[in-house]
Every structure is written in structure tokens, then in C-alpha cells.
Amino acid sequence: MSKARLLFGSMFLALAVLLSSSAIAQPATHLLPKVAKVTVNSPVTLTDNGDSWTLDNGIVKMTVLKRNGNLSSLVYHGIEVLTRGEYWEQMPSGTVTARVTIDPATNGGERAEVSVLGVNPGDRNNPSPLGGPPGGGVPAAQEPRFPAAAPAAGAAGPRGPGGPGGAAGARPPAGPRGGGMDIETRYTLERGTSGFYTYAEYTHKASYPPAGEGESRFILESMNRTFDWLSVDKDRNQLMTSDDDLRKGVVIHAKEQRILTSGVYANSVEHKYSYNALMYKLQAWGWSSTKDKIGVYFVNPSNEYIGGGPEKLDLIDHMSGTLLDYWTSGHYGGGAGNHIPAGEDWKHVVGPIFVYFNALADGKDASQADLDKLAATSGSGAPAVPQVWRDNQLALWNDAVEKSKAVKAAWPYAWVSGVDYPHKDGRATVTGQLVLDDPDAPQAAGKTFPHLTIGLAHPDYINPSGGFQQRAGNGNVVTWPHDGNYYQFWTDGSSDGRFTIANVRPGTYTLHAFADGVLGEYAKVNITVEAGKPLNLGKLDWQPVRYGKQIWEIGYPDRTADKFFKGDGDNYWLWGWGLRYSGLFPNDITYTIDKSDYRKDWFFQEVPHSDTEAWKNPAAKDPYNQRFGWVALPTGTKDPWPEWGHGRATTWTVKFNMPKTSKGTAVLRVALAGADGGNGTDPSVAGNLSIGLNGQTVGTIHTIATNALRYNTNKGVWNQYIQKFDASLLKPGENEMTFTVPAGDVTTGVVWDYLRLELNDGSKAYATPPDNQRPDYPTLE
């Protein structure tokens, strides 16, 4: 049994402990400051200003423009939060109607709500005046990239949800470009609540031409400069680069990446995509102020309206105090926009989203000695950020996370009316139990689920426009990771496979499940949910696909690279691992089954091998590992990427022993958490992965770009690839399997999840899963 398998149990135990613990980081040695309790309970007032409304509850005061539904002012604690605006990316257009949907005069000041509706049966939607793309289309920098034609014989195609590699085709227009879409945006303010709700309803009538959004989000843009601390999760909770230092930085590789030449993080690279997040796991995220000791945070009370399901990773902020809440986008290859054809009646309600404000009751100020120490250590790689700042901002974020739990627990909201939003009695709860049936698994695997994710999604369908889903590698077939059109309902199951999916809208769905330690996916079609009728699916047998006896494995399948070296939350999001890889593994990787440890001997991404170290900051103590201060700009101010950013081909070797001559078919199963650059059939194209065995090439994986490397993450849209070869190529004794990434840009290559070699020698028949489960959607050809 391999060492990787022996480590399997202990790693899962650690993972289970982590998942069961609170996401809120708590210092062990001292108490955090207290967050001020809300004591104001004034009635909500609504003032009509002619071209706008002002909503005020004595805690939050906001002004909504009638012409487009944007916020022009947002005041908390006497501080104007906005310097540019807060808005939905696609604004109401066409025939615009502004109205009061909840008048506080009719409910004793308990709640006020205003609405701006744009009816647009055929004109392209107005672009945002603050920078949104015309008609919600995709900016040029985010236009989808397409996979090449289906792999030739002997090449491995993607085997994740959605099937074989997409077919080649011409690029369709980005965004609706003249399509019709009615958009209504609403803002709601309650008595005694330190925050407000906002939501939008998108409507496409059957008579409208095709329409859609390449990306869509709610944005709080360019807040007051007082907001200088970003909180995403326990690992990314920090003082941020100032506007001035960001402007002074030198662009490297892409406009959103800059080498900082001044400030706290001088000699580091700042990149907005370092602050991406898995939307399904995100609790509360936002900015706070070390000066004014206030915070503002976004909360999604539900994930039902977010495209891409629980695997959707997205950008949640821009630099300079901007908050983002994407409900659909092409980032990382998932939930890639929505595309509504002519003839379809379609509605989609996004939100209500909650925007939360808080303030400290007893926060402390940094001393002059603290500030002097910070100044003295700026640019060193270990800036001495004052502990009082850490405590203050952590207290604010902890409070926001606690608030998010209450906001989520109250979903769905009884006060929402007039849009396509069923209340509690118009929804249903779906329950059941998945039973793992994997008789061919190594004995140590067990029958419990360390982490099970299960959900209901729209049945697979053919994408009418063919663009964004092709980027994700499944042609025009849209499956849940790539669906931005329809609602999805997901939950975490228990270790024994039991699950409860609450608040499901009526409809017909496919049930999907995936779990740590189980390669592939469970799916059951034709699940019909009726309003107010609980649905118990009973016990559901899940027999994962196996093509033969397991010979070895590296890692364990969990759709991320976090189990591998540097793939964890302390590291993966930092820009520059493509440059630093060659210093960490100067001779690349040789991994020996039964001896090597994937946690330290297998890097989380395989990229071209750079032979330059011109990027190293000579003052850095550990340039290959430290978070900040590891890079130095060469003389001049031009982008150094042409000199730094190219690497030669990289080959990793896996050594393993076979006891005797083999016969039959060997099947290599490669699960990739992400990839970049491999949208071609030519194995020399950067990003593709060539596989060799004992000096002979056995195939090439033509990967599908997800921007996981370029955009600093340990996962994109997950794909599994199958490579068959004649088992006679395996020899008695030591064998060497190689994985080669071609020369190219060091942000191309693959992000690893899991590898497994199986052998079918014909001595046993391996059952084909039932059609209605399709754990590994495509069949093995």
C-alpha cells in the first residue's frame, strides 16, 4: 500500500477537524475589542427628493437615484462611505419606472423599500456609467478562450462533469449585444438594522431576442480612503496597499499586477486576484478602517442565485476599497455568464444581498512607537503591522461573520414581494442518504464521507450561444459548474451520507454529489420538487467508477490543490509561484511511490522551469518562501516579464514498482484542480501535459484554461482526464512515469488535485454505473 494511501486517513481526520471548527480566527492570549451594540431604534424615514430618494433609519442613511437605481450617497457613523458609487453592473434601461414598493408610513416605520425598473424589450442594456461593459458584455481582457477540436486518438480528453473536450468553433459575440432584458433593482432599509438589503430581478420574455450577461455583480466602488483593511478569510485578513503605493507600482505581466516600489509591502507584487474566494464557503467579506474603526461587509444570505454552484470561485474586491458580489462570471471557468435564447420566459432574482456596517466600542489606537516600527520594517518582507490594528479589524470581521449566520438563517425573507421569490411555504425540503458502494477501493478508504457536498441543479442543457461553456471545456453542454442561468441548491452532507437541502424552489432538477476521497461525481436525474411538499429520496447507492485495480495514487481527490506543498491557504494566493518554483525544486520533482510524501514532495502546480533569478530581492531572507518583500525591480520602470516570465519544459517523474509482467489495459486518471494555457491539440503548446512511461510517450492531456495559475488560486473548474495505454508497457520492477509541461510562460501549466493508476488485467469485470447516476459523465472510449 502506498504512503499516499497511508496518509489518507490522517489527512482526512485533520480536514474534518478543520471543517468543524469556526472560521473565525481568535487570538489565544488576549481578548479582542468589543463591537458597539446597535441601540438606535428610530423609525425608518423615506424622503422624496425629486430625482432621488433618501432612506434613513438613524444608523444608515442612503440616497438612491431614480434614473438608474444607483446609490449616490451612503452614510454610516457620520462618514460618507462612497466616493464614486454603489450599483448593479447592468442597470435598468429602456422605459424606466421608479416607485416606492414598501412605504414606511404604512408599517410604523419598520421598513422602507424603493424600486427602479427598466423595461427593455430589444434595446441593448445601458452600460454602467462607472465602468461596466456595454450590455453586460465581457470586457476584452475577460473574453472567453476556446478549446481546440476534440482530442485525437490516444489523447486524453477532460472527464469531469460535462463530458469530452469542446468542439472548435468561431467566437460568438460577447454579451447580449442588442438583446432584451428587463431589470429591476431594489433597496430595503429596516428599523434598528445596521445595514441594508439590495436585490435585482432580471426578466427575459419569450418575445425578446436572445440576451444575457457575460458577467454581473453588485458593486460598492471606491469607498472613502479610510477603509484600508481587507477581510476575506482567516488567512487573508490584512492591512492593504495604499492607493498611492499602488499607483507608483510597476505593471508586471498584466495591468492588474504591480511590483510595489514603496510603502508597507514594497518589494512585493500586488494583484487583485489574490483575493478571490469560493462563494459557497464565503461568510462575510469586506473592508474596515484602522483609523475610524468601522467596517462594511457583504453577505450572501443564500447561494441559490449564484452561477457555478459550490465550486464557483470569484473575485470579491478590487484595490482601493471596492467590494464585489458576482452572481455570474467567467472567472476561473465556472458559472460562465448566462445566455437566454429567444422564445424562453426567464426570471432570475439575485439577492436580497445584505450590506452590513459595524463599529468598535472600545478599539485602541496604534501608538507612535507602533507606527515607527511599522515604518522601519516596511518593505522588509515582515512588516510590523500594529497588533492593535489586527485585533480591531479581527473583532469587526468576527462580528460580521456572526451577523452573516443570522442573516442566512432567516432566508427566505417574508417581506420580499412583487418579484419571482417564493416564501417558505412556496418552497420544499429535500432529504436523503447517499450510501458509498466502492468495493474495489483500498481497505483504508472506508465508507464514510469526510466531506460531502450535495445539491440540486437545473438539468443539463445545450447552451444556445456556445461561448463561455466551451471555455470550461464541455462544448455546448451546460452542467452545474458552468451554469449561470438557473438556480442551484447545495448543502454539506454528514459523514454517513445524510443530507437536507432546504428552501428549494419548485422545479425539476438533477441531484449531484461529490466528496473528498471519492473520484468522480454522483448524479441522479428527474428530481421533481413541489411547493410545500417535503421530498425524501431515501437511500441512494453511489458506486464510484473504477476501471481496474488501483496500483497507486498521489494525494486524494478533493477538487483543490491544498493538500500539496504550497497549495494551502497560507500560500496559494500569493502571486509569483511560477517564478519561485525553480528555486524550491531546482531539479524538478522525482516522486517515489511508498517513499515520498505528497504534502512536501509534490508542488501544487506544475509550470515551465524558469532559469532566471533576476527577480530576487537580495535583501530578502527567504525569497522562495516569504510572503512579502521577495522581489526586486530591475533598473528602470518597464515591465520585466519579457525577461523573467519564460521557462523551459518541466518534467516530473513518478517512480513505482510492479511485481510482474502486466497484461490488459492500464488507466491513468488525472484530476486537475485547474490549468492554464492548454487550449491546443499540439503537445508543445504551453499548458498541455504530456505523459510518458519508461521513455515512451503514451498520450497528451489537452487541458482547458481556467486561469487558476494566472489568477493565483489552488483551484479553478475541476476536470478529470483519462489516459489509457497497453499494460504491457509496464515492466516488472521499477517503472518511471513522466509528466511534462512544455516551455512557455510560467503562469501556464496545471494545478494538481489527484493522480491514480488503475490496471484492468481482464480477471474481473468492472461494472458500468447506471445511466441515471453518471458519476463520470462521459464513457471510457
Identify the role of each PLM range:
Residues 47, 87-156, 162-207:
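Extended, loop-rich substrate-binding clefts of extracytoplasmic carbohydrate-active enzymes
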Residues 428-439, 497, 540:
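A short, amphipathic beta-strand motif
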Residues 496, 638-663, 671-778:
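Beta-strand-rich ligand-recognition modules
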Residues 461-498:
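Short, acidic Ser/Thr/Gly-rich low-complexity loop/linker segments typical of extracellular
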Residues 220-348:
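A contiguous, surface-exposed recognition patch within enzymatic or periplasmic domains that forms
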Residues 497, 507-518:
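A short, solvent-exposed beta-strand micro-motif common in secreted/extracellular proteins
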Residues 27-88, 171, 177:
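Beta-strand-rich N-terminal accessory domains
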Residues 516-545:
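Structured interaction patches on ligand/partner-binding surfaces of diverse proteins
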